[in-house]
Regions:
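Protein-protein interaction/assembly regions in multi-subunit complexes
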Residues: 2-389
C-alpha cells in the first residue's frame, strides 16, 4: 500500500513504507451489566432485608509493546469522555408543567438531565461542531443531524397514598421515534423523585445529540482511567516497565458497549488526523506557513487531546531536534507546536506528515485488534452486547 503524505510545490510526496506497529492488546477483564442481590443481615434467607444492586459494565484491556505509550492510551481516554456523540437530556428541553413538591424546578431539571439513555444504536463516531457549539437546543430551527432520533420521556405522577412515594424509572413513559419502549431494568429502577402525600409532578423531556465537550451529560464513558505500572505506591518510587504495559479501563455510560466505544474513538482520531493533515497541506501550499528549519504551527479548534499526541510523535522523529506544545489560552481551543529540525534538515514539513501518517496507522492497528476482540465476544452464547456499529 502506498500512502500520499502531502502535496508540496506541485509534487505529491509518497510514503512507500508500511509501518510495523508493535502494540499488542489483550482483554484483561470484561464485566457486562448485571444485577446482584445483597442482604443487610448475615442470614441470607431472610428476604425482608434483601435488596438488588445493579453492577455497571466495565472493560479492562492490557496494552503493551515497543510502540505503546501513555499518550496513545490517554488520547483514547480523552476522546471517549469528550468527543463521541451520544444522546442526553439538556435542561432546555425538560419542560415541567406541574410541580408542588419540595424540590424546585431548577433542581429537578438538573437532576433529570442526568437520566441515562441506554442501548441506543447510533451509526456515527463524530459530530460536526455546527450541531453542538453554541446551539440553542430549545430552538426548533436548530441544525439537526440526519441520524438524530426522537427520544422523549413523559412523567405524570400523583401520590394518592398517606405515605411518601418513590417515583422511579418504572413510572415513566419512554418513547423512541414514537414507539414506547422499556429501556430501564425494572428490578433496579432509578429514583426520579420522592412525593409526599397529595403531591404531583408532571414533565416532558426530549433528548438530543451532543458530545461531552459541550456538557458532561453527553460523555459516552462514565469512567475511563489507566495504570502504567511505572510507580510503586508502597515505596513511592519508579519501577521499570520494559514492555510498556498499560491497563486501560473503560466504563460505558450505557449507550454503547465498551468495545464499540473504543472502536468509535479510533475512527474519530483517524478522522481528526485527516482533517489536520488536509488543513496543514493547504496552509503549506498557500505559503501561510513558510518553509523554515524552525516552525511554529497553530492548530485552531484543537486542545491537548490531538496536540499532545502529535507533539509526542514529532519528538520521536529522527529528523526533529525538538518539539514543544503550548496552549496560550486555556479557555480557547487552540494549541501551538514549535518544531526544530536537525542541522542537516531544511524543514520539518515532511516529518510532520510522516508522523501524522504513523499515528493514523497506529490507531487503525488498534481498531483492528479491538474489532477482533469484539467479534470474539459476539460469538459467545452468553454475550450481552446489544449495540451495533
Amino acid at each position: 500500500m502506498t500512502n500520499i503524505l502531502y502535496k508540496y510545490k506541485g509534487i505529491f510526496i509518497y510514503n512507500n513504507k508500511m509501518p510495523n506497529i508493535d502494540i499488542q492488546i489483550k482483554e484483561f477483564n470484561k464485566i457486562n451489566y448485571h444485577v446482584v442481590e445483597k442482604n443487610l443481615l448475615e442470614d441470607k434467607n431472610n428476604k425482608d432485608y434483601a435488596f438488588k444492586v445493579p453492577i455497571s459494565s466495565k472493560l479492562t484491556l492490557e496494552f503493551s509493546g515497543k510502540d505503546n505509550a501513555n499518550v496513545i492510551v490517554n488520547t483514547l481516554r480523552r476522546v471517549v469522555y469528550d468527543n463521541i456523540p451520544t444522546y442526553a437530556f439538556p435542561v432546555d428541553l425538560i419542560k415541567i408543567s406541574d410541580n408542588n413538591t419540595i424540590y424546585n424546578n431548577d433542581y429537578m431539571r438538573l437532576r433529570l438531565s442526568q437520566v441515562p439513555i441506554l442501548n441506543t444504536d447510533l451509526d456515527i463516531y463524530s459530530l460536526d461542531p455546527i450541531y453542538w457549539i453554541n446551539v440553542d437546543y430549545s430552538d426548533p430551527k436548530r441544525p439537526k443531524h440526519s441520524s438524530e432520533k426522537q427520544i422523549e420521556i413523559a412523567i405524570n405522577v400523583y401520590n394518592d397514598t398517606n405515605f411518601n412515594k418513590n417515583i422511579t424509572t418504572n413510572d415513566i413513559h419512554y418513547y423512541e421515534d414514537g414507539v414506547e419502549l422499556q429501556k430501564f431494568n425494572k428490578e433496579c429502577p432509578l429514583l426520579i423523585i420522592q412525593l409526599r402525600p397529595a403531591e404531583t409532578f408532571k414533565c416532558t423531556m426530549r433528548a438530543v445529540l451532543g458530545v461531552g465537550e459541550r456538557d458532561n451529560i453527553w460523555a459516552s464513558a462514565a469512567n475511563a482511567y489507566y495504570d502504567d505500572f511505572t510507580t510503586d505506591n508502597m515505596k513511592e518510587g519508579f519501577i521499570d516497565n520494559p514492555n510498556n504495559k498499560i491497563n486501560f479501563t473503560v466504563e460505558s455510560q450505557g449507550q454503547y458497549d465498551e468495545y464499540i466505544l473504543l472502536i468509535k474513538a479510533c475512527n474519530y482520531i483517524v478522522k481528526k488526523l485527516d482533517d489536520i493533515g488536509n488543513d496543514l497541506n493547504k496552509r503549506f501550499a498557500s505559503k501561510e506557513i513558510k518553509e523554515s528549519a524552525d516552525l511554529i504551527i497553530v492548530l485552531d479548534g484543537e486542545d491537548h487531546t490531538m496536540g499532545q499526541l502529535l507533539n509526542y510523535f514529532l519528538q520521536n522523529h529522527p529528523d526533529v531536534m525538538c518539539s514543544g506544545l503550548s496552549k496560550p489560552d486555556h479557555l480557547v481551543n487552540s494549541v501551538q507546536i514549535r518544531i526544530s529540525c536537525a542541522d542537516d534538515i531544511k524543514s520539518p514539513i515532511k516529518p510532520i506528515f510522516e508522523q501524522i501518517n504513523l499515528i493514523k496507522e497506529t490507531y487503525l492497528h488498534i481498531e483492528k485488534i479491538l474489532n477482533k476482540l469484539n467479534n470474539k465476544h459476539k460469538e459467545k452464547p452468553n454475550s450481552r452486547m446489544k449495540t451495533k456499529r
